[in-house]
Amino acid sequence: MSKKCMINRELKRIRVARKYAARRIELKTQMRDESLSPEERQRVMLKFHSLPRDSSPVRQRRRCRSTGRPRGYIRKFGLSRNRLREVAMRGDVPGLVKASW
């Protein structure tokens, strides 16, 4: 089980990224706009760099819903590999069976 502070930090990153998403897109399009003068583009770039670091969605890390484990995450189920194995062995995931050949 991950520390609660780590899970809360990830939730905060998600909130901040959603809050600044529109602003980031707007500033990025202005930075790429060739019709603006270099000084204006530089000013826009400074505004973009003044945004919080956590507003970037790249900084987010996917975590297991039940344990908060950051590694071995399987997107389809939203669980880590360890937790998915436990849940699958109990038969809680419909259609998921252990492979045998």
Swiss-Prot record:
One of its GO terms (biological process) is translation. Pfam families: Ribosomal_S14. It comes from the Bacteria. One of its GO terms (molecular function) is structural constituent of ribosome. Residues 59-72 have a biased composition (Basic residues). Residues 52-72 are annotated as: Disordered. Gene3D superfamilies: 1.10.287.1480. Belongs to the universal ribosomal protein uS14 family. This is Small ribosomal subunit protein uS14. The gene is rpsN.
